[in-house]
Amino acid sequence: LVVSGVPPQQAALVAKSTPIALDEPLPLPKFQNRDDVVAAIIRALDGIDSGFVEALIRREILASGIIKTWNEILVPALVTIGKRWEESGSGIEVEHLFSEIVKRIMRDCTNEIESPRNPKPVLLASIGEEHHCLAIHALAAALAEENIATHFLGARTPVDALAEMVRKTHPPVVFLWAQLTKNADYSAITSLPALRPAPRLILGGPGWQAAKAQGATMVDNLH
């Protein structure tokens, strides 16, 4: 509810009035092994058949949605490409090609939102010198599937620019991505302007360390 822009007080009242089983954990999404699809994508990328790759990913999104496509197909493909580069030093052109295809698709999915249910968009950014931003492209698209609008600042967002954007837009949630430990700029936690209500700060990616992220919520999956 808060992500959607509902004021925290109202969200709390709704939550209190909604019966839930406190002893039952929230169900985790079930993901399938899609090694066959991943292998098909890798073969097509090796053949520089970007049309096939793009059509396949778009078909999977239509059939299963962003979250399942990201976790079952796109992440495994990225891991495969990354491992091959680490082992052989080759394939960087494949990684760049694949990344641009995924970005284009996710942008298209994000642009399809017409009637957002949140009056103030969620703010997404890769912090500091972090140039990896595929995950937040996917997050923006996944939120768009739920009619949740976002402001996307992209890669290498300076902390002062982030703070100014928060001041101007009053987002209900700020999501910051750090793929690498060296790019996790913890000053972002204390540098955001004091707003009422305060935006919820969520840190995503393996670059963040929980011990240094007091005052923020950490997530390690796009679920």
Regions found by a protein language model. Give the residues of each.
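Long amphipathic alpha-helical segments
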Residues: L1-E114
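C-terminal regulatory/effector modules of DNA-binding transcriptional regulators
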Residues: S88-H223
